[in-house]
């Protein structure tokens, strides 16, 4: 059976949802929540599910983090001798959080449906200046879905007349039948130290070959030496890969059982100030990154 696509109405009447599916695999992407991947089943195995009763505006579930990942302390930064003040959307910590795409409405601009895969292209064009980020850009998200994998390619085009700073990331939450007995494996020798407001203070050495989740409450950021992260659960093994050479991994356990956020990023919190992972995009220049999820075995 070839992949199919349909638009459905969300349980909340204002949600615009695109569903891509065949007999064993499905994905639901919410157009007006930043074209975020809210549900994903690969080969009958649920990997990403609704986080109810947690709210999207609190979880940023599967949103693309752009033009900055995680936080900007007090919403203040300087770039090329100009000082900027962004909106504060994490009020209790007085930070700007997770960029500007999470609540934007994307459009479907192309789709290719085949027997073995579906490719859907979503686009958002920012034509107005944002407080603290007076630049324009075009974003395309290309979701490629197969029975045992999902690829997400992000293309950013600077449409403004000036160079802008950026980092980029992705914020998916994965479900496990038993998170206590699930494990994370990745190559890292350094992690970020945070203050009480989750702003980096520095780094410390990290020498564990894997993390057994158990009852750990995690909100950690790791410098990755390779672009591969393995998530092993009792029912599936997942590989998360990034095309970026300089990668970081934010790991977060939300206040919901058997769920964990694994966030691949190109920078760390407060990167607009500490410059760790910070990049620049010149006028008419493009940046592209690909993240891929692959089930390598399942029961």
Give the ranges of each region predicted by the language model.
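Short, acidic/polar linear motifs in exposed loop/turn regions
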Residues: 160-161, 297
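Extended, loop-rich substrate-binding clefts of extracytoplasmic carbohydrate-active enzymes
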Residues: 1-8, 12, 89-146
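Active-site/ligand-binding surface loops and adjacent short beta/alpha elements
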Residues: 84-86, 91, 162-165, 172-243
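Short Pro-Gly-centered flexible turn/kink motifs
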Residues: 77-85, 280-296
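Short, well-ordered beta-strand segments enriched in hydrophobic/aromatic residues
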Residues: 18-20, 27-29, 141-143, 150-158
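Acidic-aromatic substrate-binding/catalytic surfaces of carbohydrate-active enzymes
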Residues: 26-83
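Generic N-terminal segment detector
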Residues: 1-47, 277, 297-298
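Acidic/His-leaning functional-site neighborhoods
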Residues: 25, 95-111, 201-203, 209-277, ...
């Amino acid at each position: 059976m070839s992949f199919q696509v349909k638009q459905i109405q969300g349980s909340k009447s204002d949600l615009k949802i695109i569903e891509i599916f065949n007999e064993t695999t499905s994905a639901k992407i919410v157009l007006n929540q930043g074209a975020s991947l809210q549900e994903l089943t690969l080969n009958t195995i649920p990997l990403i599910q609704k986080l109810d009763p947690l709210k999207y505006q609190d979880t940023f579930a599967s949103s693309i983090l752009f033009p900055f990942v995680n936080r900007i302390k007090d919403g203040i930064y300087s770039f090329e001798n100009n000082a900027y003040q962004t909106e504060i959307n994490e009020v209790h910590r007085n930070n700007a959080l997770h960029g500007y795409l999470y609540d934007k409405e994307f459009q479907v601009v192309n789709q290719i449906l085949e027997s073995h895969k579906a490719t859907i292209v979503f686009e958002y064009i920012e034509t107005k200046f944002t407080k603290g980020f007076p630049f324009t850009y075009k974003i395309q998200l290309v979701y490629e879905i197969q029975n045992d994998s999902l690829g997400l390619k992000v293309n950013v085009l600077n449409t403004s007349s000036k160079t802008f700073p950026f980092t980029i990331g992705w914020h998916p939450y994965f479900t496990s039948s038993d998170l206590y007995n699930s494990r994370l494996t990745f190559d890292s020798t350094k992690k970020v130290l945070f203050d009480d407001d989750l702003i980096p203070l520095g780094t410390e050495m990290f020498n564990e070959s894997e993390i057994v989740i158990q009852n750990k409450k995690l909100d950690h950021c790791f410098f990755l030496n390779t672009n591969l992260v393995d998530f092993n659960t009792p029912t599936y093994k997942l590989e998360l890969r990034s095309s970026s050479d300089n990668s970081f991994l934010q790991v977060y356990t939300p206040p919901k059982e058997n769920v964990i956020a694994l966030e691949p990023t190109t920078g760390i919190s407060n990167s607009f100030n500490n410059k760790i992972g910070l990049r620049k995009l010149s006028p008419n220049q493009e940046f592209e990154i690909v993240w891929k999820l692959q089930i390598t075995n399942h029961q």
